[in-house]
Amino acid sequence: MKLLVFSDVHLDAPFRWAGPDLARKRRSALRAAVTRICHVAEQESVDAVLCAGDLYEHEYFTPDTAQFLRASFAELARPVFLAPGNHDWFGPRSLYAQVQWSPNVSVFREDRLQPVELAEGLTLWGAAHRAPANTDGFLERFVVDR
């Protein structure tokens, strides 16, 4: 089984250190990276795609970014799993909660590890940050039931 795993894209990052033109170019490059990730997923015929957090910046995301992500992942002919990180944490006002995702997209919503069986004998475990910073680690008190 082939998985494409990525993280820390930080779409809509403000790039405060850059001038307006450079910041705009950097944000455009981040979108291009997501487009490239989707292209590689198709080209390499991966079985699933996983974003392991910080896909976007919670404080700065726009409706356009929500639509871009929805459309990008809907075009993939494979499952997509999104695990919200500390910069794009899951909550009622998060992009993750507001978007009507296509059936191939699953968002981890709990702050404890949840299993998803990908294939016989292969389980993906994922969780969501539910705030900008979690004090407990996801592995504390975690036991795999065998």
Regions picked out by a protein language model, each given a short descriptive name:
Residues 48, 59-146:
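His/Asp/Glu-rich metal-coordinating catalytic cores
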